[in-house]
């Protein structure tokens, strides 16, 4: 890959990464793959390269993905009505068949293929495999009352042994966000990939949870671009949750869940930027918003980078 950096600048980039390579060696990093990074061909390639890079320098990446745009496209192509209530997809049994097919048969296979173009590293599995996830059907409060949105659930338990086996074998697990209903194991639920990634990060003792989005991070006062938060304590974030817009709230709730589960750091980063994961992990400034177990709030504009 050609860059405009001089040789000495390239060396500076590598040296800046050295302490982070040392600090994160052998650590597990759970990455929620989503947003524009899933639909733009160049960004998909960059994401696959990032996962391979992490693996080759001694980290253990674990990928969890959804597939909202791909599901919507397939439902439309098949003439199946797609309804949303309170920003959540109503998942009928007919739609669930499509969700399962798209996530495990299309999105997962494509990402596994992109990673494995660099060597036999990635293995696809879903929340159904090896009892990885168990979920409970969800009845969210919409307009003040519990609402039936069909076969949609929240992960309530994790058996990470299948993922642990893959990590021990040097593989990169790629996990699709569907899960059996804990009350009826023959029924499969569509689960939120952000929440599933947080639950898995806690279960495997991940050093970081990284969630890819289509925004720069969490803003304290959107649309003021100077209000981009660089670091925020989990209690400060918990206080903000009720006022967050519907697209950002589940991602920040996932960060809270990860921190509450013992994950030291959770990040929201802009997946529209090529190699954003490497920029977050291996540079001093990082990018996006980092959630920490302690208290406090720092604006990214205060960093001086």
Swiss-Prot record:
It is found in: Cytoplasm. Pfam families: AA_kinase. Substrate binds at residues 67-68, 89, 190. GO terms for cellular component: cytoplasm. GO terms for molecular function: acetylglutamate kinase activity; ATP binding. Pathway: Amino-acid biosynthesis; L-arginine biosynthesis; N(2)-acetyl-L-ornithine from L-glutamate: step 2/4. Belongs to the acetylglutamate kinase family. ArgB subfamily. It catalyses: N-acetyl-L-glutamate + ATP = N-acetyl-L-glutamyl 5-phosphate + ADP. The record marks 32, 251 as: Transition state stabilizer. This is Acetylglutamate kinase. The lineage of its organism: Bacteria, Bacillati, Actinomycetota, Actinomycetes, Bifidobacteriales. Its EC number is 2.7.2.8. It comes from the Bacteria. The keyword Ribosomal protein does not apply. Keywords: Amino-acid biosynthesis, Arginine biosynthesis, ATP-binding, Cytoplasm, Kinase, Nucleotide-binding, Transferase. The keyword Zinc-finger does not apply. Gene3D superfamilies: Acetylglutamate kinase-like. Catalyzes the ATP-dependent phosphorylation of N-acetyl-L-glutamate. GO terms for biological process: arginine biosynthetic process via ornithine; L-arginine biosynthetic process. The gene is argB.
